[in-house]
């Protein structure tokens, strides 16, 4: 078992899964993984299935050169998006694996959240393509390593309201004016 980039804060309430040297594009997978980060497990699975069916798009934020625009990206406050089906399928398999690990450890599957997900480049695989005039060009693939951890979300406890009303926050300019008024009155 290898070392993960980020260990969970509470190992008893979390589970992990990873895949190495996966034959899926690094750039597409990185953008897809970033989209599901901090999502609840069920929502992340539904999102990835919708991406495969082209009902929701993945926003492309960093690797967006030459990527076309789509209306579905408005949901993410951007205009650039795609539907990387193969990346979504690989991530779905990893989420399924992590869910099985959580079930084995006795965690509540409905309260799991994607706490950490990271995509790293794997060594490129080299093939060749034949060109005109007897030349040969490289035909590379960019596989990746994926690791993720799911954490059981804790109950949110609301803070008790105090009897004192909250003080209104004043800007520096208004505070200065109040001080000047007090100085004039004295």
Swiss-Prot record:
GO terms for molecular function: structural constituent of ribosome. Residues 160-186 are annotated as: Disordered. One of its GO terms (biological process) is cytoplasmic translation. The keyword Cell inner membrane does not apply. Keywords: Ribonucleoprotein, Ribosomal protein. GO terms for cellular component: cytosolic large ribosomal subunit. Gene3D superfamilies: Ribosomal protein L22/L17 (3.90.470.10). Residues 177-186 have a biased composition (Basic and acidic residues). InterPro entries: Ribosomal_uL22 (IPR001063), Ribosomal_uL22_CS (IPR018260), Ribosomal_uL22_euk/arc (IPR005721), Ribosomal_uL22_sf (IPR036394). Pfam families: Ribosomal_L22. Transmembrane segments: none annotated. It comes from the Eukaryota. Belongs to the universal ribosomal protein uL22 family. This is Large ribosomal subunit protein uL22. It comes from Aedes aegypti (Yellowfever mosquito). The lineage of its organism: Eukaryota, Metazoa, Ecdysozoa, Arthropoda, Hexapoda.
